[in-house]
From Swiss-Prot:
Keyword RNA-binding (UniProt): no
Keywords: Glycosyltransferase, Transferase
EC number(s) recorded for this UniProt protein: 2.4.-.-
Superkingdom of origin organism: Viruses
Species, as recorded: His1 virus (isolate Australia/Victoria)
GO molecular function, one term: glycosyltransferase activity
Sequence similarity: Belongs to the glycosyltransferase group 1 family.
Enzyme class (EC, first level): transferase
Pfam family, one: Glyco_trans_1_4
UniProt keyword Oxidoreductase, yes or no: no
UniProt cross-references to SUPFAM superfamilies, sorted A to Z: UDP-Glycosyltransferase/glycogen phosphorylase
UniProt protein name: Putative glycosyltransferase ORF31
């Protein structure tokens, strides 16, 4: 079956449905968002943000059409971190087990999802990103203007920033610069309480125009113990920023050009990033990586492969 033969109904879309439609627009796949008659299509693709997926899953369980779920982050761990009841967690695993396929954005997450739910038809489709649509951050001075963008709902995303803050603050105090953190969520108060005492670190809440914040930065920090392939890292690459992460397993195994550093070695890593030439080189590597791995054509073909595999098995 060729891509031209496949039709996909994208149901229960979140605010980021363009992460699917953009790459699919570069394929021969016919698709419709929020179709009135989704079961007239070859495949129903659920695009629910993680914690909103239970009701759509329950409805899809009775479908005669193959149902595929786009796994947005580590959704099963999200259920646990948000303190959902054990009943809801077991219900989610049960409903997930009736899926015909799942599409995470990186293989490690896919293996974990398969091991927990029993879903076997797992195929990876990453995120499409191009520097054409993002600012071109400038590297001309030695003063670091650090930026982090994250989801503040999960302690696994928040705690590493709190842990690294004393080390980063001391470095900035000696060398100048500032670290701005953007994002919203239920742990905003916790983050503010723990970072409010630093003169050179600011928790800024949600940014309406994040692109302008990237344009005014010259290095990204993405410190997390709860992620698959963060969209923010790709946005950093697209915005001509070098990206520094902590040695979380997903980052350590990642083949993209991020700079992984341990807590006590953050000084040395930040020191190297003071050099504008080093930042430009690292940032250029990120943009070249996007061109090689994250074009909409590449991601669209990844979706096509998953859909063909699901249809062949049904």
């Amino acid at each position: 079956m060729s891509g031209r033969d496949i039709s996909v109904a994208i149901q229960y879309p979140g605010s980021r449905v363009n992460r699917i439609t953009y790459p699919l627009s570069k394929t021969n796949i016919e698709y419709e968002v929020s179709a009135d008659n989704p079961f007239d299509f070859d495949i129903v693709l659920l695009d629910c943000p993680g914690l909103n997926v239970l009701k759509p899953l329950a409805k899809a369980k009775f479908s005669s059409v193959p149902v595929v779920y786009r796994v947005q982050g580590d959704v099963l761990r999200a259920f646990q971190e948000m303190n959902y009841t054990n009943f809801k967690y077991r219900s989610a695993k049960y409903l997930f087990s009736h899926l015909d396929g799942a599409i995470p954005i990186e293989p490690v997450l896919g293996r974990r999802f398969s091991n927990v739910t029993g879903v076997r038809n797992i195929g990876t489709a990453t995120l499409a990103k191009s520097e054409k649509y993002w600012p071109n951050a400038k590297h001309w001075d030695e003063s670091l203007r650090l930026i982090s963008v994250t989801n503040v709902n999960y302690i696994g995303k928040v705690q590493p920033m709190v842990d690294y803050a004393p080390y980063i603050s001391r470095f900035l105090q000696r060398n100048g610069g500032h670290w701005n953190i953007y994002g919203k969520g239920r742990l905003a108060g916790y983050l503010q309480d723990n970072l409010g005492g630093y003169d050179n670190i600011s928790y800024c809440g949600y940014a309406e125009d994040i692109k302008s914040r990237y344009a005014n930065s010259n290095c990204m920090l993405h410190l997390s113990n709860f992620d698959s392939l963060p969209n923010a890292i790709l946005e950093g690459f697209a915005s001509n920023l070098p990206v520094i992460t902590n040695p979380f397993s997903v980052f350590s195994d990642y083949h993209g050009p991020i700079e992984v550093t341990e807590l006590k070695k953050i000084d040395a890593k930040l020191c190297s990033m003071q050099d504008p030439t080093t930042r430009r080189i690292k940032a250029r590597q990120g943009q070249e990586y996007l061109k090689a791995k994250h074009t909409p054509e590449i991601v669209g073909e990844q979706y096509s492969v998953v859909f063909r595999s699901v249809l062949n098995d049904c």
